């Protein structure tokens, strides 16, 4: 696979976009699919400021003409792994932007491999533990009291050097004592160590509350049958054929995500191509017990509160607010890449 990419643009209108999403190269305003290309040896590249600001796109190996206006040429001096693409462009401070990973972080214990979920809506849920039975609560979501941690997991205690990045079932917060060690220091999929990182408390807070039009760029929903929370990118332009309603339901309940708004997989592909990020309501883990799956979502920050607690972003159908929680609880992780 290629390790680097060079690009030149001959001519292109500034109102058009070129993006890669869900196995398709998309172009135009409104975005249209280009079906005549092959998609091996993909690479991420930034634009030459002729597209929308900071648009991330992916192009194929060798030379290809796109809509008779864009000339893309790959030119590399060596072999290497293809890095992962990011989703959207999001301000997390007055002078910093990030792009989100394509899915929640996952870890396979038997192979010591870190990876991202294939789709943004994917989550492991009650299968984070083995043994026991699933109890479905129509208000709060699915619960399961297991007997052991599964081989593949995506709910982690707060990451310190003493806990194998939070892959631990200890319920004692003292066992998670120490400074944070970012999950992004690992090799994740084909990405080199330190490619990705965890948002701090201040960055999550800025994304949720402070950036321009923050309240208009977040909302609960159900995507492809999965409950969760959507964050829209800074320069949001809603694609044709779909609409987005920001905000939250007035009450907390599993069914109220879908009652607020829903998107099919096809509709979501348009939103994702336009930079939308979806955080599934994956519940949380305490020891060998998993709770509130599809009722709530909980996403770690990199910031400690004290020796026993750290900050995270929890959400339900009724709201999303930063709180401090026990380090020993297992929560979801969605990493970002600095731009």
Where are these regions (language model features)?
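Bacterial Sec-dependent N-terminal signal peptides
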Residues: 1-17
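A short, compositionally biased
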Residues: 11-15, 42-45, 83-87, 308
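Short N-terminal segments immediately surrounding and downstream of signal-peptide cleavage
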Residues: 15-30, 87-95, 233
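N-terminal targeting signals for Sec/Tat export/insertion, comprising classic cleavable signal peptides
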Residues: 21-46
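Short amphipathic beta-strand/extended segments with alternating polar/hydrophobic composition
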Residues: 26-32, 61, 247, 312-315
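Coil residues (strongly favoring Ser/Thr
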Residues: 36, 47, 62-63, 69, ...
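Collagen/collagen-like triple-helix sequence repeat recognition
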Residues: 43-78
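Conserved positions within compact, well-structured domain cores
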Residues: 77-339
């Amino acid at each position: 696979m290629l390790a680097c990419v060079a690009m030149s643009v001959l001519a292109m209108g500034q109102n058009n976009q070129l993006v890669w999403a869900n196995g398709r190269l998309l172009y135009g305003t409104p975005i249209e699919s280009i079906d005549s290309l092959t998609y091996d040896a993909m690479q991420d590249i930034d634009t030459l400021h002729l597209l929308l600001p900071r648009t991330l796109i992916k192009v194929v190996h060798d030379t290809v003409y796109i809509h008779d206006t864009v000339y893309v040429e790959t030119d590399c001096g060596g072999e290497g792994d293809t890095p992962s693409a990011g989703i959207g462009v999001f301000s997390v401070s007055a002078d910093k932007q990030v792009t989100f990973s394509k899915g929640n972080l996952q870890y396979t214990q038997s192979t010591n491999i870190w990876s991202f979920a294939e789709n943004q809506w994917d989550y492991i849920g009650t299968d984070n533990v083995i043994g026991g039975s699933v109890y479905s609560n129509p208000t709060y979501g699915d619960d399961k009291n297991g007997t052991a941690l599964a081989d593949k997991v995506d709910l982690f205690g707060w990451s310190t050097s003493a806990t194998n990045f939070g892959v631990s079932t200890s319920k004692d917060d003292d066992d998670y004592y120490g400074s944070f060690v970012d999950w992004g220091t690992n090799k994740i999929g084909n990405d080199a160590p330190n490619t990705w990182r965890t948002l701090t408390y201040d960055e999550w807070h800025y994304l949720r509350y402070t950036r321009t039009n923050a309240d208009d760029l977040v909302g609960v929903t159900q995507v492809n049958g999965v409950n969760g929370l959507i964050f829209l990118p800074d320069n949001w332009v809603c694609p044709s054929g779909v609409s987005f309603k920001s905000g939250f339901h007035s009450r907390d309940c599993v069914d109220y995500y879908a009652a607020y708004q829903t998107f099919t997989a096809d509709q979501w592909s348009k939103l994702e191509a336009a930079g939308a990020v979806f955080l599934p309501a994956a519940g949380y883990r305490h020891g060998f017990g998993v709770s509130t799956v599809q009722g709530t979502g909980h996403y770690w920050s990199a910031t400690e509160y004290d020796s026993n607690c750290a900050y995270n972003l929890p959400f339900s159908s009724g709201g999303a607010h930063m709180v401090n929680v026990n380090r020993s609880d297992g929560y979801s992780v969605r990493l970002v890449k600095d731009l």
